[in-house]
Amino acid sequence: MNVSLFVTCLADIFYPGVGKDTVEVLERHGCNVKFPENQICCGQPAFNSGYHEDTKKAAKHTIETFADADYVVLPSGSCAAMLLEYKELFADDPEWEKRAEELASKTYELTQFLVRVLKVEDIGAVCHKKATYHTSCHMSRLLRETEAPFSLLEQVKGLELAPLANKESCCGFGGTFSVKMPAISEQMVEEKVGHIEATGADLLIGADCGCLMNIGGRIERNGKTIEVKHIAQVLNSKE
């Protein structure tokens, strides 16, 4: 099965290991992974800031870049959700709206793809940790995906998963929200970290690098030792 990886900006710049683990997990489950080198940002920062014409430029580039892909897989619910938003951008342009719909029909967040398309029942990972999982907003609200990550984490040998209170609440990142509303964002992430600490977990897992960067930064600033990992890293773990 041919899969094209949309690595995302944050994974590419700050978490390259997430991209590597994503590729290895997909390959382990029979995928031939391609990486289009001319891929760029999905356009979400511009979209969230109201620059819709600039977003359209990024969207057209992405649509053309992945036009021949069988499947497009992203290690990010947020960026995957943005690709699904493209068709709304081109509601007044039938040609590009159709092309956007074609891209959306083959776009999946990583855990979605593993569960919904590949039907993985044994992820083949080992992680002897007590962990808790942060559910990101865009993945749960826009992609409407809440089950796939837990389905896969339950297959990880040695992993003890502790429930997180108020798991549906935002961590305060929200892309440009954390820049525009820093005081509110700080209060939100502080509350999130408090709930994480209350689980007694020594590992926080999430599916979006933006959330993990925000929460991980607060954990470090608070002097705590909770490890923070993207779910791709856990699904590729052997320890």
From Swiss-Prot:
The protein, known as: Lactate utilization protein A
Source superkingdom: Bacteria
Protein family: Belongs to the LutA/YkgE family.
Known role: Is involved in L-lactate degradation and allows cells to grow with lactate as the sole carbon source.
Gene Ontology CC terms, in alphabetical order: cytosol
GO MF terms held by the record: oxidoreductase activity
InterPro entries: Cys_rich_dom, LutA
UniProt organism field: Shouchella clausii (strain KSM-K16) (Alkalihalobacillus clausii)
HAMAP family: LutA (MF_02105)
GO biological-process terms attached to the record: lactate metabolic process
